[in-house]
Swiss-Prot record:
Keywords: Calcium, Disulfide bond, EGF-like domain, Extracellular matrix, Glycoprotein, Repeat, Secreted, Signal
Subunit structure: Homomultimerizes and interacts with various extracellular matrix components such as FN1, LAMA1, NID, AGC1 and CSPG2.
Record-given protein name: Fibulin-1
Glycan-bearing residues: N173
SMART domains: ANATO, EGF, EGF_CA
Domain Anaphylatoxin-like: from-to ranges: 29-63, 68-107, 108-139
Superkingdom: Eukaryota
Amino acid sequence: MDLYMIVLLSLCGLLRAQETTDTISLDNCCEDGKKRGLESQDCSSLPLISESTTCRVVQEQCCSAVLEDSICTSGINMAKDQSSCDALLSGSSTCETKTTKMCCECCLLGSSRCRIRVSPVSSVCRWSISRGPGVRSCCVDKQPAHGVQPSKGDAQNTEDQCRAAGCAQRCLNGTCSCLDGFKLKTDGKHCEDINECLLGPHHCVTGERCINTLGSYRCQREISCGTGYELTDNNKCKDIDECDLGTHNCAAEMECQNTAGSFRCRPRMQCAAGFIQDALGSCIDINECVSVTALSRGQMCFNTVGSFICQRHSVTCGRGYHLNAEGTRCVDIDECAGPDNSCDGHGCINLVGSYRCECRTGFIFNSISRSCEDIDECRNYPGRLCAHKCENILGSYKCSCTAGFKLADDGRNCDDVNECESSPCSQGCANVYGSYQSYCRRGYQLSDADGITCEDIDECALPTGGHICSYRCHNTPGSFHCTCPASGYTLAANGRSCQDIDECLTGTHSCSESESCFNIQGGFRCLSFDCPANYRRSGDTRPRVDRADIIRCVKSCQHNDISCVLNPILSHSHTAISLPTFREFNKPEEIVFLRSPTPTHLPHMDSPEIVYDILEGNIQNSFDIIKRLDHGMIVGVVKQVRPLVGPVRTVLKLAMNYVTNGVVSHRNIINVRIYVSEFWF
């Protein structure tokens, strides 16, 4: 059964259930869908030719059927032309490509059934066979017409020609051709995509941009639809119905009306007579008295809710007048008549419609309140009446002085008071203009409580007290004094710093004659430097060792001692340093410098490279060694990179390696005895 008839019959139930007055038949709907499918239009967004939902479904199904037949026919033609589906758009995974390949492979199965008479393949290619007689014809076309059997040699010859041609897509009698949307390359075998956008055979209209695809193209809109519109699947702009979607902002008493690209809010109700509608749709009263002009003489307009009324005008007298006895006119009021007049004890003068008060000294008449008011002399004449403070009183003013002054005999100026005559301060007093200042002797400060009592300054407790004395600070009344550790230090001449006692220099050490005295901060150490076997001491034996002294043991081999000669260590050096416990360790401290001249560049050998290393004694990884060049010298710099809190003792074993071509030719060992004091000074 034809696919289009299947579509029409499957929709019969829907037709019976749907009442419509549409005059367009389902055949017309299907024919329109088939036409648009032949034009390769998008079947999911076809222009409607009827308001009927059934017609729209028939359009889409008939359009899809035409597209599917076209896609399947391409696969069947490839199978017939090339007897192979391998070259079908290799690597593509689109739905169209999969359908084309499936129909191609099912056609090959149908052809094989005819040649080798295998079991029917209808169960395997059921969907492809339902596409029409195309797949079934793959077997039928192989049968000879009118009962004449084709020559086996002719069929074999055609198949051999296509196999030898090596066509990429289609082959007919050894001649290659391409699918729709492709063209044959100059080699006559392979196919390349046709760029419809570049060559011009596309259907994109003005405002759409053509985008080339493999074997086809698509049209994309270039300009957005703008506010109030949305882009549909068929690349068209459609008005957004804000009223239907509920995206409008109309108030509850307003009704939303959709317009092209926008919407309007219209009032739901009409206002009664005497009312007008505001911007929010509410009915508000009209004040008719603002616009009414046809009033009779002697009448007044009074606005009411939704209307207005007219009343006869009555006689009203202004301020300072009252109605006469007849009630026909206004006459003056004598405000000064009687003992209780309006001037409240001041002189009163009656005027027509008013009055005026004759005020006493220190008062002024207020024409608005019609009364005598006190004159504030202090505010009217600031700084001109009193030297310090001015206080207004009823009808006059008086002067006063600030603290530290007393009023002069003239009642306006102020004289300074000498407060020091009463000895208010505990130590010293200095009179100043209008006050006094207490001061204290050195080592004392004024109390924050009263500002006159002198209190002892605890210099040791001040924020900088930790820096006043090197070791310990002891407060005394009005002063302080510093002390140093019980041994190893003495107080300097400034009375604050602690100086180390050099026991080695003063001879107060206890080292034997075979030992060397080394002074450290706060003490001394007796050091004994012994050279290892096959090494001898270089230089004289010293009774004391300074920081810069280095005791060296150089290699001295016995005759024919091969192991000694081959030993790469040329020397063992000893030195000692004393370090404080750094109070503020903010950056690495350079403590030891190992200097060596730059190796001489000999013409017959490579110059060795000096490499420094820490072998032992690097407690807590507190030390590091780097190499740098300084004035033609290679310097190994030992740095303290982490703080150490004394007392700490360690022996830092350093190696100075001479490396030539990656091999250590010889090395020098340096033993540095490090003593870290528990104090920072």
